[in-house]
Amino acid sequence: VAAGSRILFSRVGQVAANAAVVVLVAQQLGPAGQGHYSLTVAVTLLSASLLGGGMGLAAVPALRQGRVTPRRLMRAQALWMGLMSVVLGAAAWWAITDDAAASWLSLHLGWTPALAWLVAVGAFGMLGFEIFTYNLLARGRLVVGSAVNGWRALGHLLVVAALLLTGRLTPSTAVGAFAAAQLGGLVAIIVVACRDLRRPAQPINGMPGVPLAPCELPDDLDTRPLWKLAAFNPRHGALGQLSAVAYFLLLRLDQGLVEHFRGAAEVGIYSLAVYVGEMLWLLPGALTPLLVHSSAADASDPRRDRTAARAVRMGVGLTLVAALPLYLLAAPLLALAGGGQYEASVNALRALLPGIVAFAPGVVLAGDFIGRGKPHWNTQASVLTVVVNVAVALALIPRHGAVGAAWASSIAYACGSAVMLWRFRRTTGMSLRGLVLGRHRRPLPA
């Protein structure tokens, strides 16, 4: 409870800082500039997801079972990050020097040559932050990642505010502030992870003596050459990492479709609604790191499944409580982000909120599935959700624009969440009454 409260506190601060950044950028850049900014951030997210390689996901069972020392694992991860920095640098160089690529990026994303390097820096910071956050989660440091995220969001806000006050907030400097925030978060998490090497790993709180869920790992993992250890993680974490890629496509592919059919200004209108709505997921997301840790317990202990079900109920409750007033106050709140420029964002946000609430269980269960050693379940649900989203979006966006994209997302989110809840109930054998009401037929052992 204490860890969850601290994570939630950090997430609330992160939500507030992110909301302020969205408002400042949207006000200054206008719909077209906001659209280009949102699409550029999406490219950064996609690059980080593709190049993460499952290095963080694959580390969780290895660290939890003591098959590899944290110090050697970090060295292998640093080797991987070095290779990915070369890939990002080469991609940025190609985006600048290839005339066709530079022309396309300028037309659709509003890029200047310098932006390619900023995107590479931001993607490098994001993929490294994710890797080392999983290391800390595996060692029982449940709060650290959320705390650093909160400080990263605050730093991002301060930089954006300074740029605005000095009259220097442009699309390029907005992306630069975003990239600097990601790189700063990486530096902070590396410092924390290095300091953590001197501490013993923490046990599963509240579950003394509970064995870890079985996960097949080679016995010689810690004695392999560093390059083989670095190669092991992508082979065993790539499938789970596809979940991050699919999740990105779920959240941002529709913006690409909006740009294709309706232009960058419509993306700006839609992206503002998306940013505001998705901030609500930070609340149930506070429970995700707890489940990554607690759901690694053996299935023989019933507290594991009931803890996950309780987290689902809490996540839905938190999201619903925040979504109801946001639905009612959407018009005056979005007016703060640019007045009449973003009037159309109101209906898009209201169409998006039912899906935001419906997907809250999926946000929570993503951590549970990772803890069980089944991250590919997240991938399967995300892929299905993407397929539904694209199919409905292609039908609605050409005619209805941002509102059509929002309804397509809501329908897709509901489908994805339903699949994840079905998977959870099938795996645990939990009744619907137990999941929804917390009333179970069998009492917990004394």
Regions found by a protein language model. Give the residues of each.
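Interfacial segments at transmembrane-helix termini and the short loops linking adjacent helices
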Residues: T97-V119, A264-A265, Y327-A360
